[in-house]
């Protein structure tokens, strides 16, 4: 049972008991218990708790941020090779009046939407669509903003047959050489190569309770411990939290969230995001393309220097 399910269970218990006892003296007041449980759960969240917060069904997805932060949005479709991918949102729009290209891994807000966008797991068509729009952005001098929120690339046979690995690898190569600014925003889950394919950037901004790792804790536990139930233990070992990644130099800016998650006050987080994006775009747009690419390459090379 996740932390949010525990809290929901406590709320339902209060409702059911009060429904059966309508007298003022008999009514159950669980407010104190709820607050105590919330405080205990969220005061010092461990890595596994952060994974659960990042996966929370009511956590605002990329579509929320895009609608709140951009204007004149025109969605674009197709990779011009084999098809489209609903899990990859691509568009042009304006950020505070500046034309930008927007790429986002799309998750739904309910089961039907998640089925339509494959729970945020991209196919090769999605990565190729993203690359097509990034090359278009380079041609017209538009900064690129990518929103990462995926458990990983789609691992199905159809994706492998269409060249999933090649599509991801090509994005890594091409993004490292693009002549326009690239800023990546990690909203929830940043899983495996599926996230990396949108993360070769000049600056990375990450929400406080987001996670980013080579694979899921369940996958890590299955491979190394031969036991998927040890996922919580694996999460501690993987150093996947925003705080760990910031300390090791992988993430440039951390954006604070409410203690229980962004879903409690998304408007405040949007305002903070907007300010950070504005400041970073101003600085990056001042750089010549050769300096931009050199700095991006140097940033990537530093990752191998992390001390374990």
Per-region residue spans from a language model:
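Generic, ordered loop/turn and secondary-structure boundary motif
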Residues: 43, 54-57, 66, 70, ...
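Intrinsically disordered, low-complexity segments enriched in small/flexible residues
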Residues: 1-99, 119, 267-308
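Cleft-lining beta-strand/loop regions that shape enzyme active-site pockets
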Residues: 94, 101-176, 182-187, 192
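Short, motif-level signal for alpha-helix interfacial/capping segments enriched in acidic residues
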Residues: 23-25, 126-127, 220
């Amino acid at each position: 049972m996740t932390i949010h399910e525990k809290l929901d269970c406590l709320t339902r218990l209060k409702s059911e008991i009060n429904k059966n006892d309508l007298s003022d003296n008999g009514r159950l007041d669980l407010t104190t218990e709820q607050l105590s449980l919330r405080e205990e759960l969220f005061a010092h969240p461990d890595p596994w708790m952060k994974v659960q917060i990042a996966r929370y069904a009511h956590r605002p997805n990329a579509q929320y941020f895009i609608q709140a932060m951009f204007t004149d949005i025109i969605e674009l479709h197709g990779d011009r090779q084999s098809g489209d991918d609903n899990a990859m949102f691509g568009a042009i729009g304006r950020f505070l009046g500046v034309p930008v290209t927007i790429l986002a891994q799309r998750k739904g807000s309910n089961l039907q939407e998640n089925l339509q966008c494959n729970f945020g797991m991209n196919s090769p068509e999605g990565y190729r669509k993203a690359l097509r729009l990034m090359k278009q952005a380079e041609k017209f001098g538009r900064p690129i903003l990518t929103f990462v929120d995926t458990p990983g690339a789609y691992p199905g046979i159809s994706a492998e047959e269409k060249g999933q690995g090649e599509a991801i690898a090509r994005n890594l190569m091409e993004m490292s050489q693009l002549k326009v600014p690239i800023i990546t925003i990690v909203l929830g889950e940043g899983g495996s190569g599926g996230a990396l394919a949108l993360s070769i950037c000049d600056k990375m901004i990450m929400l406080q309770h987001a996670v980013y790792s080579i694979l899921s804790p369940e996958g890590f536990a299955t491979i190394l411990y031969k036991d998927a139930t040890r996922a919580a233990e694996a999460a501690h070992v993987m150093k996947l939290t925003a705080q760990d990644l910031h300390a090791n130099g992988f993430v440039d800016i951390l954006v604070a969230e409410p203690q229980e998650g962004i879903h409690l006050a998304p408007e405040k987080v949007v305002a903070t995001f907007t300010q950070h994006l504005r400041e970073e775009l101003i600085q990056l747009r001042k750089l010549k393309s050769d300096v931009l690419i050199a700095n991006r390459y140097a940033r990537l090379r530093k990752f191998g220097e992390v001390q374990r």
